[in-house]
Amino acid sequence: VRPANRVTPGLNWVANRIPILDLDRTELRQGFALSHTIFTPEDIEAEIPDQTDRPYAAWLYASGTVVGTTRLGPGQTVQDVMQVTLGIVGPTAGGEFVQENWHDLLQAIEPRGWESQLKDELGLEITAQRLRQFEGPALPFRLETDNALHGGVTLGNVRTYASAGGMARLGWDLSSDFGPPRIRPALAGAGVFKPGQPFGGYIFAGIEGRAIARDMFLDGNLFRDGARIEDRRDFGADLQLGVALHQGDVQIAFTYVHRTEEFVAQSGPQRFGAVSISIAR
């Protein structure tokens, strides 16, 4: 995510049609990304996958993000984020090729159920989010504190949901970012990193709740028949804990995520980690 004097026309056209966003901010940034995500059931050795588990799916997509930030007054900052994501779900996304070759390289279990994956379908998501950050009291050893509240909505044929949550942080040079970037759906953190000191870092904890209207990776294709589950949960939540450190213009962050069950037959909550490396520009 880089500083920008103006927003790319296509992204600006979308942003102007989202009434909850205000991108006329003091600081404007935009960025672009190419990503690939794979979903599989728990038992990948079965040639006929468990119908009560999530279907095989791959999602290859490009996204454009616009971030507008302004300081409202002493100790309070507002950030608006708009993201447009366009991609392909299905065999064309290459999930089978990537997983099978990766498992061959690692000499791991061969996945056998990709024949039942979701069918090809173009995917579109538009995300709008507002975050309000409040500076907390200063502590001994020059420690800083802050907390943030955020809310947003994502609309599209891939996923449609509303989210709200909060985060608290403790450390040094907290103004360098709004939290480390993570794979959506996730807590706010737009990937903006701008260090104010040569060295800094923080620990953080956050929670987010989501009301989910659609998730293609559980509900199946929207425009084509195929694999799906019937017992997706309409509400979900994440608990996230982590640490971020930066030296100069490079930041490394680790996030531990505890995610509630996404469907009734799921064997338990998901627990996973995310590592990100950011370079200030």
What is each PLM-predicted segment?
Residues 16-98:
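Long, hydrophobic/aromatic-enriched structural stretches that serve as scaffold segments
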Residues 12, 143-155, 228-229, 254-260:
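Transmembrane beta-strand segments that form the barrel wall of outer-membrane beta-barrel proteins
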Residues 1-3, 34, 62-68, 86, ...:
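Residues on the lipid-exposed face of transmembrane beta-strands in outer-membrane beta-barrel proteins
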Residues 42-44, 167, 172-281:
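Outer membrane beta-barrel transmembrane domains
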Residues 1, 28, 56-60, 80, ...:
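Residues that define the transmembrane beta-barrel architecture of outer-membrane proteins
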Residues 48-51, 109-116, 152, 225-229, ...:
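Extracellular loop and loop/strand-boundary signature of outer-membrane beta-barrel proteins
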Residues 3-28, 69-81, 133-147, 173-201:
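Short loop/turn motifs that connect adjacent beta-strands in outer-membrane beta-barrel proteins
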Residues 39-43, 71, 89-93, 133-137, ...:
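Sequence/structural signature of outer-membrane beta-barrel proteins
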